[in-house]
A protein has these predicted regions:
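Fe-S-dependent hydro-lyases/dehydratases of central metabolism
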Residues: 1-335
């Protein structure tokens, strides 16, 4: 539940830094008390958009509404737009250090957000259209500013990302972001405004309005009736028919400009990341008899927690100073 999100982040800090049973800074103590994260709580200044801001553990530096889980759910997309509308009306905005983006999986989403007048509100709080399809959840959000990257890495800050995708592996979203949270599109907007995962959005304000009055999540959260009134824009079947009537025959100008090879078999080029599988080297149409047993087998590797295939074969951006990055640079592959 949302009420335990901040506590979940403190557990992340504890997992990374170990635990400390001594008295810790009050702001770093989780709601349960007892064993708590080591009281590091480093706060450093980073220059973003020409101004200095304090970055600390839990600072949300990426907030993204992504394609993989929102296209088929107009209810939450309209909900996100209404959160943005209400926040905008109160003078709230994303925190300057939060990189925000909106990447629907379909142009239909853009059409009903525009028709409902919600895209303008999303734009106002930083959720501009970035494109369609896989972006942030595969590490393609674009990099953070050099100053922000340096502040995070040089001070071992556990920064956070909040996205409405379906992957939150360490470094999948960004190589320098270790704490990643999955949330609904409306909550992504709310956390972009709050700017930090250590806030309990059930009890603490997300920000202050133009008069300096605290604004809580309930003040900007839309009712079911408010969302329902705008659902008619998303339930227009003609929009879907228009966008998908001739996808194969007319895929669009960008796709038309992509060159491709022709033939029955793929012409494998020399590549640093695509290789012909070696088990096809002596491939025969008639399979050979399988061995009668397996002998001398051993485990290739035994790993601890929080290890995924992303650590073996990066699916997102690759660090230039890591082994894979150095190997690619040695082979003339530029970032």
């Amino acid at each position: 539940p949302l009420s335990t999100a901040a506590q979940s982040f403190y557990k992340t800090v504890s997992d990374y830094r170990g635990v400390d049973k001594s008295a810790a800074a009050q702001e770093m103590q989780d709601e349960g008390g007892g064993v708590i994260a080591a009281p590091v709580d480093v706060r450093k200044t980073a220059k973003v958009e020409g101004a200095d801001y304090t970055i600390r553990d839990g600072s949300v530096v990426i907030a993204a509404i992504t394609s993989c889980t929102n296209t088929s759910n107009p209810y939450v997309m309209i909900g996100a737009g209404l959160v943005a509308r209400k926040a905008r009306a109160l003078g709230l905005n994303r925190k300057p250090w939060v990189k925000t983006s909106l990447a629907p999986g379909s142009q239909v989403v853009s059409e009903y957000l525009e028709a409902a007048g919600l895209q303008e509100d999303l734009d106002a709080v930083g959720f501009n259209l970035a494109g369609y399809g896989c972006t942030t959840c595969i590490g393609n959000a674009g990099d953070l500013t050099p100053e922000l990257n340096a502040t995070i890495t040089q001070n071992d800050i556990i920064a956070a990302a909040v996205l409405s995708g379906n992957r939150n592996f360490e470094a999948r979203i960004h190589p320098n972001i270790r704490s990643n949270f999955l949330a609904s599109p409306p909550l992504v907007v709310a956390y972009a405004i709050a700017g930090n995962m250590t806030k309990d959005l059930m009890t603490e304000p997300v920000g202050k309005d133009t008069n300096g009055v605290d604004v809580y999540l309930g003040d900007i959260w839309p009712s079911s009736q408010e969302v329902g009134e705008l659902m008619r824009f998303a339930m227009n079947s003609e929009v879907f028919k228009k966008n998908y009537a001739d996808v194969k025959g007319n895929p669009g100008a960008l796709w038309e400009r992509v060159s491709s090879t022709e033939g029955q078999v793929y012409n494998w080029p020399e590549s640093t990341y695509i290789a012909e599988p070696p088990f096809f080297a002596d491939f025969e149409m008639t399979p050979k008899a399988a061995a009668t047993g397996i002998t001398g087998a051993r485990a290739l590797g035994v790993f601890g927690d929080s290890i995924t295939t992303d650590h073996i074969s990066p699916a997102g951006s690759i660090k230039e100073d890591g082994p894979a990055g150095k190997w690619l640079k040695d082979h003339g592959v530029l970032k």
